[in-house]
Amino acid sequence: MKTYLVGGAIRDRLLGFQPKERDWVVVGSSPQEMKSRGFRQVGKDFPVFIHPQTGEEYALARTERKSGHGYSGFEFDTDSNVTLEQDLERRDLTINAIAEDEHGTLIDPFDGQKDIENKKLRHVSDAFSEDPLRVLRLARFKVRFDDFEIVPETLDKVTEIIESSELDHLTGERVWLEMYKSDNPWLFRKELTHMGADDVLYIDSKKSDGICLSPNMSNKLHMISCFIHEEVSNIDEFCLKLKIPNEYKDLANLLNQSKASIEEYEPVTDSYQQLIDIVKKLDIRKKDRLKNFFEVYTNDGNKGKVDFFQSFIEKLDQFRLEDEDRKKPNDEIKKVIEHSHRILAQDHIREYLDNQ
């Protein structure tokens, strides 16, 4: 039994980046032996084991054979006789097919180091075209390593995948995961478009309002919600197809619904009802969503407008009915609240204008 560090950790280190995680491949072992050493088995498709101390993933060396459609249409062989080179041969790109033994010696049968030096994204073998997920991974790596070039032979393999209709067998969840992993969803879509594979994102048409220009690119929720808001016409349908979490969908919908009206709003003496209507649509009860909404908006350079709305919302939050009003019928209570909100809005606008 021998273990090797493989894949992204080595690639990133050779590129001068700090590896985010480490993955290992185990040669000459079996599920029984791994479990006897305290490893915990996970994964349904093939044996992956979690190290009892580090929590890092260890996968048995394997080969694979195409047996169906999509990224899951493979049969795996994890026999103890599978070699390291055979395992590396099934990987997607040469830069991801480098291993390191316990002595720090690199095993690089497909010249991944040379492609890193020459800034090339190149498939390892003809098996690349059997897995449609690799098109999305290729786009993601091109976004991350923007100064790398996809070699023509690999683009030919992408064309083979597209023409085979294998992309149609990718699940929405897998498409979402690759988009989530990408450093920039706009560039991710752009790379897929260059490859002729952007249909896999299920984006029906591009909107052109250009409202959300400067999301915080270090905040996935802000960045992806802005992308959905900016690029997708039917947000609910798109998020349903890709199984996108509700917090992304909800923030994108709120951006769609309220960002333009806030941007267009100008505080003047008789605009108090417009102010109230805008704030109602924000649904200030959903505090986390509201916080993210204003963070996105502030990042677009609108701090003054954000301060104006947030301070008004704080006043609404602090408003309390008098004890005598609480005893009134519901329809009367509603009228009291609406009247009080109008007074608060008028006073807030007046205070703002006095300070200008």
Where are these regions (language model features)?
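Catalytic cores of the polymerase beta-like nucleotidyltransferase superfamily
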Residues: M1-Q356
